[in-house]
Amino acid sequence: MSLLDLVLLLLVLGLGGVLLLRRKGEDRSAQEARELLEAARREAREVLEAARKEARDILEAARHEAKALRQEAEARAKAQREEVEAELRRRLEAAEAEAKKRLEEAGERLKAEREELRAERERLRSLQEELKEERERLKAEREELRREGERLAKRAEALDARAARLEEAEAELVRKEEALKAEARALEERFKEVERRLYEVAGLTPEEARRLVLERLDRELEEEKAQRVRAALERARLEARREAQKILAQAMQRQASETAAQLAVTVVPIPSDAMKGRIIGREGRNIRAFEALTGVDLIIDDTPDAVLLSSFNPIRREIARMALEELLKDGRIHPSRIEEVVEKAKQEMKTFIYERGEEAALEAGVVGLKPGLIQLLGRLHFRSSYGQNVLKHSIQVAHLAGIMAAELGLDAALARRAGLLHDIGKSVDREVEGSHVEIGIALARRFGEPMEVVDAIAHHHDPDNAETLYAVLVAAADALSAARPGARRESLEEYLQRLEALERIALSFPGVETAFAVQAGREVRVIVKPEKISDAKATLLAREIASRIEKEMNYPGQVQVTVVRETRAVEYAR
């Protein structure tokens, strides 16, 4: 029974009671009415209480039923939601898989397209490089043809001038031949006349007369030969030196550079003598590791606040100096740290060498050098010859060769290039077998240098065999740079031995009284005995001494031979 039914029942009972009271009101008394009313109320309360209890039971059952329905609905909703979520996940996974597949396919297509594009770019780049190289080759060939044409034109002009000089010389020889024939006829007649007079006056035999005449002729011819040699040498000097002195003087006046003597020991200052123990390390492990990694002897002696680095390889010595200074600055000195710092110093040294090569090329006005050649050029900064820095010497030779080439109407840039690279073989002559000339030729050919540069490297010590004028210019510039006072130095022992050898060669000739090597071995003054050496023989003697010095000795620059003949006439007035 529902709550609405209970309420309706109570209303019906109430109305029934009221009607009953009205109907029996007249017959019954008020007491009975009250009793009936009270009974009706009790019954109504009982009914109401029962209705309430039933209503509570119904409500509780309804709640349980609603809860069960709610749980069932929630379970169905949860199941539906999980089913929907599973479906959504499945669809999402399928969509993601499809999208991933499409992305992979698109990535593969993009990668393939990129590879094709990269290959196309590489092909275009290679074609551009080939085109550039072909243009450079054609440009070089045109330049070579132009230079060859200029050389042929100059050679033709020189040949024409030489032919003209030869014709003049031939005519002069014909005239001299006629004059000599006439002189010979005159001498023959004079000889016959002298012979006849000798026979008549002296009563000499023909053999004795012939001997006297031959001795006289020998003396006259010897005097004439000496005079002609002296005159020819003077003419050659005047003609050959006049223009050369002008060019060399201009070049030397326009060029001035410093020189530097390279030692085999580097001094590194340290903060205090206490640092020497840290440098040595426990049981000498630090110093052994340092020497093994650098190849340089680390000398720690009683020198206050300094240590010495000794090595005949200047690059290794400089790397060791940089590494040691970094270790002293950092304060951490142990084998692993030493290895790290030495490797860092080696990398910095490579950069430093390349920068020195670039600076040298820039200072010499040479462009277009390959990076490998610039690196080799920078190594010359640490190379010395007779105490002269080879890189500075090469720069100076480049300037001198360029100046002289400009004066002669040649390619100054090419001359500077040849001068700068003429000693390039000295950069690796300690690591590679062969002379610095042979190594330099191989390097120049490997880096594609012009033929003139290769020829200058090959013949800068023997210009007589050179094929181009640039080799002659480089040889002259090399001699100028090396012959400057103070440019090069030798050890004291070699210096003294060279001076003694110069004096010994001069004293070995007959008629020489004494000899002095002066001007740091660049001049030999020879004092001869006047009664044994005539003025004519003095010139021949100077030439013979110079020739023997050239054959038997090695020396930088040139040596001047001066022969002094002094005749003294002494008489006393009594």
From Swiss-Prot:
SMART domains: HDc, KH. It comes from the Bacteria. Endoribonuclease that initiates mRNA decay. One of its GO terms (cellular component) is plasma membrane. Keywords: Cell membrane, Endonuclease, Hydrolase, Membrane, Nuclease, RNA-binding, Transmembrane, Transmembrane helix. It comes from Thermus thermophilus (strain ATCC BAA-163 / DSM 7039 / HB27). It is an enzyme of class 3 (hydrolase). NCBIfam families: HDIG, PRK12705.1-1, RNase_Y. Pfam families: HD, KH_1, RNase_Y_N. PROSITE patterns: HD (PS51831), KH_TYPE_1 (PS50084). Its EC number is 3.1.-.-. This is Ribonuclease Y. Its main location: membrane. Residues 264-327 form the KH domain. The chain crosses the membrane at residues 1-21. GO terms for biological process: mRNA catabolic process. It is a single-pass membrane protein. It is found in: Cell membrane. Residues 390-483 form the HD domain. InterPro entries: HD/PDEase_dom, HD_domain, HDIG_dom, KH_dom, KH_dom_type_1, KH_dom_type_1_sf, Ribonuclease_Y, RNase_Y_N. Belongs to the RNase Y family. GO terms for molecular function: RNA binding; RNA endonuclease activity.
